[in-house]
From Swiss-Prot:
Topological category with respect to the lipid bilayer: Single-pass membrane protein
Lineage: Eukaryota, Viridiplantae, Streptophyta, Embryophyta, Tracheophyta
Conditions for induction: By auxin.
Similarity field: Belongs to the cytochrome b5 family. MAPR subfamily.
Molecular-function GO terms, alphabetical: steroid binding
Domain of life the protein comes from: Eukaryota
Domain comment (free text): The cytochrome b5 heme-binding domain lacks one of the conserved iron-binding His residues at position 100.
GO CC term, one of those recorded: membrane
PANTHER family listed in its UniProt record: MEMBRANE-ASSOCIATED PROGESTERONE RECEPTOR COMPONENT-RELATED, NEUFERRICIN
Pfam families the record matches: Cyt-b5 (PF00173)
Gene name in the database record: MAPR4
Protein name as catalogued: Membrane-associated progesterone-binding protein 4
Length: 245
């Protein structure tokens, strides 16, 4: 049996100790950028540094104040990429507006409908599932302590309301089947019903969902045609099953 003193002084123990130290050193030295930025609070000026122009830095993107590392999507988010306009900033509005220049690249959701705000919240969910969250952007949606602001809570509430209205509209419209439709450049469009006749009807929840009114084509039986709000297609016979549009 090797005496304790001889064991502690043996070359084998010394080499093992050095290997362990080196291992710990490299483990601490090569932490991923995602780990280094975890739970960090960014200012707008700081976030702008991670816009893909400096290849030594990760590429970060903000949406509703949540910041994600999108470096693995460098082809899209890096300099010259199709989505580079989102890098280094929170351009939440542009996810639904399609305005990728000037004032369009803003985190303000003012004037957007509940369905549009829901789409932005859904986009945030996509980034949460696909990329690594690395912190919060101090400003409109998070305060200097990293707590959600009234703007974030309001956006999430509006998105939730939009989801409820869309589900309600889907349920209501399922009660009256949609018309069949087709369109070609040569012949134009037409709508038809396998059962019943086509009528244009208002979508009553649409203004609350999208901010504007719209109509859809639905099929009605003859004994339902006395309902208010049913519109006959122009130049179409009242009981025709097919109408040109």
């Amino acid at each position: 049996m090797i005496p304790a003193r001889r064991f502690l002084l043996s070359p084998f123990v010394g080499v093992t100790f050095i290997v362990v130290l080196v291992s710990l050193y490299f483990r601490s030295s090569f932490k991923s950028p995602q780990h280094q930025y975890q739970k960090r609070l960014f200012s707008a000026e700081e976030l702008a540094l991670y816009n893909g122009t400096d290849e030594t830095l990760p590429i970060l993107l903000g949406i509703l104040g949540s910041v994600f590392d999108v470096t693995k999507g460098k082809f899209h988010y890096g300099s010259g990429g199709g989505y580079n306009h989102f890098a280094g900033r929170d351009a939440s509005r542009a996810f639904v507006s399609g305005n990728f220049t000037g004032d369009g690249l803003t985190d303000s959701l003012q004037g957007l409908s509940s369905s549009e705000v829901k789409s932005i919240v859904d986009w945030r969910g996509f980034y949460s599932r696909t990329y690594t969250p690395v912190g919060k952007l101090v400003g409109r949606y998070y305060d200097s302590q990293g707590n959600p602001t009234k703007h974030l809570k309001g956006a999430e509430a509006k998105a939730s309301r939009g989801a409820q209205l869309m589900e309600k509209q889907k349920t209501e419209e399922a009660k009256q089947s949609n018309c069949n439709s087709r369109w070609s450049q040569d012949e134009g469009g037409e709508v038809w019903c396998d059962v019943g006749v086509p009528r244009l009807v208002q979508r009553p929840l649409e203004i609350a969902i999208t901010g504007s009114m719209s109509k859809r084509c639905a099929c009605f039986e003859e004994d339902q045609l006395d309902q208010s709000g049913l519109e006959i297609y122009k130049d179409c016979e009242p009981l025709a099953k097919t109408c040109r549009v």
